[in-house]
């Protein structure tokens, strides 16, 4: 009897596998945005994101990532990264228990020194020229009271505020 139950259970779970269910996690416009992001990263247009694609994409943004950093990014995937895997990885991250990490890691892609800061001019350029482009006014609003004296944006603190709210500060 227990083998029948196990068999029935396995059959029930099959339709809910990550590849078939991942497209149901997002609406059509979100999937389109992910596709645009995937295509931006897939520099050689072979339908897969590999280490060279990541390197070329980051180099196009003025970054020179180390081999170790690239390996770390690639090791987050259990196998080759085609669009379905890319979407699955984002789906798992976005529906995970700590979306704060997802946001922080998105900023960290542009923080070569892993300092927790991105210079305001560089971040403004990225935000106004890539993906869902921000207007200068939207960037100004995001920067309000968040740029230090050296002109750096503290994305670690910004992410914390996004997820947990601002702490009261006595200036």
Curated annotation (Swiss-Prot):
Stretches assigned to the EF-hand domain: 29-64, 98-133
InterPro entries per UniProt: EF-hand-dom_pair (IPR011992), EF_Hand_1_Ca_BS (IPR018247), EF_hand_dom (IPR002048), Myosin_RLC (IPR050403)
Tissue expression remark: Smooth muscle tissues and in some, but not all, nonmuscle cells.
A GO CC term attached to the entry: Z disc
Transmembrane helix keyword on record: no
Disordered: region residues: 1-21
GO-annotated molecular function: calcium ion binding; myosin heavy chain binding; structural constituent of cytoskeleton
Gene name tied to this protein: Myl9
Biased composition (Basic residues): 1-15
Stated name of the protein: Myosin regulatory light polypeptide 9
GO biological process, one term: myofibril assembly
Residues with N-acetylserine modification: 2
Modified residues (Phosphoserine): 20
Gene3D superfamilies named in the record: EF-hand
Cellular compartment(s): Cytoplasm, Cytoskeleton; Cytoplasm, Cell cortex
Gene source species: Rattus norvegicus (Rat)
Chain residues that bind Ca(2+): 42, 44, 46, 53
Note: This chain binds calcium.
